[in-house]
Amino acid sequence: MNTAAPSRKKLLSLVLTLVFMLTCLPAALAVDLNVDAGFYFKQSRGGTCTLASAAMMLRRRAYFDGLTDWSTVTENSVRSTAWSNGLSHSFTYKEMQVGYATLPSGLQSKTAVLISLLEQHPEGIVFYDRTQPHAVLLTDYTNGIFYCSDPAGNIGYG
């Protein structure tokens, strides 16, 4: 009687199960950056929506990069390197570089550029509207909808 075959089948089954579990593990442990895991907050005072949005973006980038102190990225911690009577157009905070760009004219062109930027920068984009002087953190584009976090104190969700 051959008892080796059933043992090999059990061992192979166990190994395949472990391999399957290991391939699923990263997805199971991943945090969706669009779910609030402590990334988002409201601005500390009026007129700092750009600073608060930038701090949330940097907080998400720090988390994404695996920095354990990502939750210490706050409006106040970013202020000294990013703020001078308004958000600086370019600055570096904890080795994370932030730049400035202007969107092209035309809705389709703007949409295409924003989608491309979000693909390159999953931490998000600080989006400032000069006509409404206000900034939000643009975080995602899914199924034709842009998602954002609005730091304004009078906005409950968004």
What are these regions (language model features)?
Residues 15-23:
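Bacterial N-terminal signal peptides
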